[in-house]
Amino acid sequence: MSMKTLPKERRFETFSYLPPLSDRQIAAQIEYMIEQGFHPLIEFNEHSNPEEFYWTMWKLPLFDCKSPQQVLDEVRECRSEYGDCYIRVAGFDNIKQCQTVSFIVHRPGRY
């Protein structure tokens, strides 16, 4: 059995070991968040160091969001304005008062 060496890229999260997610795959993740009752929000940052806890929020969390398409539209808008930044979608649980899900949907120089 031969082992494959991964390219020397910085890994950020579980999904970073996969090829970049398509809009359809991102929509499926967002749909899961909405079904769980989490409020989606979009954040961006110039760097994606694991030590950086504070990202800039893109607008306000989408509290009234009912469809993944609404979030995808905001992701596209954020990509067009901050294409040189990392962009992630996060899910906020207002009962536990914490972020429960987050994944990167855009890496600079990738799309």
Swiss-Prot record:
Q: Which residues form a coiled coil?
A: none
Q: What induces it?
A: Carboxysome size and components vary with growth conditions. When grown in ambient air at medium light (50 uE meter(-2) second(-1)) there are 853 RuBisCO complexes (RbcL8S8) per carboxysome, the numbers decrease under low light and high CO(2), and increase under high light (at protein level).
Q: Name one GO molecular function term.
A: ribulose-bisphosphate carboxylase activity
Which GO terms of type biological process are on file?
photorespiration; reductive pentose-phosphate cycle
Q: Sorted alphabetically, which keywords does the UniProt record give?
A: Bacterial microcompartment, Calvin cycle, Carbon dioxide fixation, Carboxysome, Photorespiration, Photosynthesis
Q: Name one GO cellular component term.
A: carboxysome
Subcellular localization, per the record?
Answer: Carboxysome
Practical use, per the record, is: Heterologous expression of 12 carboxysomal genes in E.coli (ccaA, ccmK2, ccmK3, ccmK4, ccmL, ccmM, ccmN, ccmO, ccmP, rbcL, rbcS, rbcX) leads to the formation of bodies that resemble carboxysomes, have densely packed paracrystalline arrays and RuBisCO activity. These structures open the door to generating carboxysomes in plant cells to increase their photosynthesis and productivity, as well as tailoring bacterial microcompartments to specific metabolic needs and molecule delivery.
> What is the superkingdom listed in this entry's lineage?
Bacteria
Quick one: where is this thing mainly located?
Answer: other
- Describe the task this protein carries out: RuBisCO catalyzes two reactions: the carboxylation of D-ribulose 1,5-bisphosphate, the primary event in carbon dioxide fixation, as well as the oxidative fragmentation of the pentose substrate in the photorespiration process. Both reactions occur simultaneously and in competition at the same active site.
Q: How does it assemble?
A: Heterohexadecamer of 8 large and 8 small subunits. The CcmM short form purifies from carboxysomes in complex with both RuBisCO subunits; a second complex with full-length CcmM and RuBisCO also includes carbonic anhydrase (CA, ccaA). RuBisCO-CcmM complexes are probably associated with the carboxysome shell. Isolated reduced and oxidized SSUL1 binds holo-RuBisCO (RbcL(8)-RbcS(8)) but not either subunit octamer alone; RuBisCO has a higher affinity for reduced SSUL1.
What family does this chain come from, according to its entry?
Belongs to the RuBisCO small chain family.
Which additional comment does the entry carry? RuBisCO folding and assembly commences when the nascent large subunit folds with the help of chaperonin GroEL-GroES. Both RbcX and Raf1 help folded RbcL release from the chaperonin and dimerize; dimeric Raf1 binds to RbcL(2) leading to an RbcL8-Raf1(8) complex. RbcS displaces Raf1, resulting in holoenzyme formation.
**Per its record, how is this protein called by name?**
Ribulose bisphosphate carboxylase small subunit
What gene name does this entry carry? cbbS
